[in-house]
């Protein structure tokens, strides 16, 4: 049985003129939930990403990195190290594994998430995918490293070449986003990419109908509009990039209400 839909809502109205901070407008998935609920939610969230082609901006960024002569030359003697922060159920990294296998690009993939139950779900999903002999990415998926931890405490022996995040930054407070930008700028050797949502009243209004029509987890009907309310507009990113003293990043609007930030060295 799934928990009841309960959440704290702000007592004063929030407008779309500004971003709602996570503490003002929590998602149901922000609270403590049993593993079965988290697993089912993350499985259906992957369906949302596939339906909305949410991986497309991230894979296009990787194509740009792979097409850079300087980048290829700097890592040609070893696999490209890619870190996905806030990896959730791991569907983005599994999509990247397929991308890399199709292009014969050696990669070393790591997923980092604060929630140990998300890490557990990512491993479970990956074990299933890697057992499919028809899947060209199965060997890469089997070797994805799933780590539980706080990104700001994460200090690997070998720095990542690329740091990615997908639908992660809207879970952070605005000061934490600035800190995350600085962390990526300091740690990513070749570049970094944020794939998140564009704050939109219209998208928030229409989104709840999709889970009902397509049979997705009922929490998604609630959390989708909340995520859109906690999301960003270009002016937000301009301000936070300035606060992080980053001038070389680009802000990119993509289809299906995605707003991304890219940095290639």
Language model regions located:
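Conserved beta-strand signature within the Rossmann-like core of class I S-adenosyl-L-methionine
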Residues: 188-197
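N-terminal auxiliary segments of SAM/dcSAM-dependent transferases
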Residues: 1-31
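Conserved Class I S-adenosyl-L-methionine
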Residues: 230, 234-265
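Class I SAM-dependent methyltransferase Rossmann-like catalytic core
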Residues: 28, 35-69
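A conserved beta-strand element that flanks and buttresses the S-adenosyl-L-methionine
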Residues: 164
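C-terminal alpha-helical "lid/dimerization" subdomain adjacent to the S-adenosyl-L-methionine
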Residues: 197-242
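A short, conserved alpha-helix within the catalytic core of class I
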Residues: 172-183
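Class I SAM-dependent methyltransferase SAM/SAH-binding core
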Residues: 83, 89-132, 140-153
């Amino acid at each position: 049985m799934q928990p009841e839909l309960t959440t704290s809502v702000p007592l004063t109205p929030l407008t779309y003129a500004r971003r709602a901070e996570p503490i003002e407008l929590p998602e149901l998935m922000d609270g403590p939930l049993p593993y079965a609920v988290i697993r089912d939610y993350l499985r259906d969230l992957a369906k949302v990403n596939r339906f909305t082609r949410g991986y497309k901006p991230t894979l296009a960024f990787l194509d740009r990195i792979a097409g850079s002569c300087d980048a290829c030359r700097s890592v040609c003697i070893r696999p490209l190290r890619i870190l996905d922060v806030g990896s959730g159920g791991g569907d983005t990294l599994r999509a990247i594994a397929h991308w890399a296998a199709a292009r014969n690009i050696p990669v070393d993939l790591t997923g980092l998430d604060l929630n140990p139950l998300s890490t557990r779900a990512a491993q479970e999903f990956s074990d299933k995918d890697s057992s499919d002999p028809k899947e060209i990415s199965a060997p890469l998926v089997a070797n994805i490293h799933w780590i539980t931890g706080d990104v700001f405490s994460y200090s690997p022996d070998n720095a990542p070449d690329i740091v990615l995040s997908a639908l992660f930054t809207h879970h952070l407070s605005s000061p934490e986003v600035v800190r995350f930008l600085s962390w990526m700028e300091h740690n990513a050797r070749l570049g970094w990419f944020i794939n998140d949502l564009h704050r939109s009243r219209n998208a928030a209004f229409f989104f709840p109908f999709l889970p009902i029509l397509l049979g997705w987890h009922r929490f998604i009907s609630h959390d989708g509009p909340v995520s859109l309310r906690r999301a960003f507009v270009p002016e937000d990113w301009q301000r936070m990039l300035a606060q992080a003293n980053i001038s070389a990043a680009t802000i990119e609007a993509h289809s299906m209400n995605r707003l991304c930030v890219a940095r290639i060295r």
